[in-house]
Amino acid sequence: GGSCGQCRVKVKSGGGDILPTELDHISKGEAREGERLSCQVSVKVDMDIELPEEIFGVKKWECEVISNDNKATFIKELKMAIPNGEVVPFRAGGYIQIEAPAHHVKYSDYDIPEEYRGDWQHFGFFDVESKVDEDTIRAYSMANCPEEAGIIMLNVRIATPPPRDLSLPAGKMSSYIFSLKAGDKVTISGPFGEFFAKETDNEMVFVGGGAGMAPMRSHIFDQLNRLDTKRKVSFWYGARSKREMFYVEDFDMLAKENENFEWHVALSDPQPEDNWEGYTGFIHNVILENYLGNHEAPEDCEY
């Protein structure tokens, strides 16, 4: 507990002192105002707490899997249909919680395209099994934007055991999600979120890598397609090799159609067959060396 920082409440009385596990997510100023992580607060006396207003708009839906396709070696795009007549009123940058029942999943049963199977075989991942005896809930950011209605789309990276010790447990939820097929039913709840764009004219700089693509795509599509923003927007994305890049055509099209948008990719381990002539290295270093380091006012940007 205390690792995701998503269960913030304001404790007005009765919560005791803030714990060290909470300080990675709550500043000293916020702590003085009573901000706490509810999962870390022991209820020993009567308490007075204040919950975020959006919590009371949370609902559950039983969705149906439309598709569950690999977008990279270890990342799937899970696309689910919302029940007819229903709406998940989320904002770009928001997230839902997804539920997994107790399950026994064999990685050898996964539908992994041939182009990605080499790494799975190399690391021995097809020998892995995930056995979970209880219901599990995890949070994932939406990759679709609100305008892409009727669906919930997630980018999920599988949490495999480390190759050096495949006897260690695999990620409970990601192992389950990778087993889903079209037509399967999945229960979600939401919407939740705090990672929302501010209503300013400031430049927007998006930085992400891997499955961190999801909220970036949601925000950027929302800004450019729905809001038709005139703010300067750039996206800096990190991937291991060219094979791990996805949504390339989408972002190329956005850059072509919007003169205020540009996007850049850095590969940390480009392969010879990639014939890569773009940025190399880790994306946080690349953006510092090639953009923010020479930016006239990086502190004014919205990240």
From Swiss-Prot:
GO biological process annotation, one example: sodium ion transport
Main localization, broad class: membrane
Coiled coil, from the record: none
Subcellular location per the Swiss-Prot or TrEMBL entry: Cell inner membrane
PROSITE patterns named in the record: 2FE2S_FER_2, FAD_FR
Domain 2Fe-2S ferredoxin-type intervals: 1-55
Domain FAD-binding FR-type: 58-198
Record keyword RNA-binding present: no
Binding site for [2Fe-2S] cluster: C4, C7, C39
Known cofactor(s): [2Fe-2S] cluster; FAD
Gene Ontology molecular function: 2 iron, 2 sulfur cluster binding; metal ion binding; oxidoreductase activity, acting on NAD(P)H, quinone or similar compound as acceptor
Source organism, top-level taxon: Bacteria
Record key words, sorted: 2Fe-2S, Cell inner membrane, Cell membrane, FAD, Flavoprotein, Ion transport, Iron, Iron-sulfur, Membrane, Metal-binding, NAD, Sodium, Sodium transport, Translocase, Transport, Ubiquinone
Chain segments carrying region Catalytic: 201-303
GO CC annotations on file: plasma membrane
Catalytic activity as recorded in UniProt: a ubiquinone + n Na(+)(in) + NADH + H(+) = a ubiquinol + n Na(+)(out) + NAD(+)
Cofactor binding, per record: Binds 1 [2Fe-2S] cluster.
Entry EC number(s): 7.2.1.1
Quaternary context: Composed of six subunits; NqrA, NqrB, NqrC, NqrD, NqrE and NqrF.
General function of this protein: NQR complex catalyzes the reduction of ubiquinone-1 to ubiquinol by two successive reactions, coupled with the transport of Na(+) ions from the cytoplasm to the periplasm. The first step is catalyzed by NqrF, which accepts electrons from NADH and reduces ubiquinone-1 to ubisemiquinone by a one-electron transfer pathway.
Similarity remark: Belongs to the NqrF family.
Protein name, entry field: Na(+)-translocating NADH-quinone reductase subunit F
Gene behind this protein: nqrF
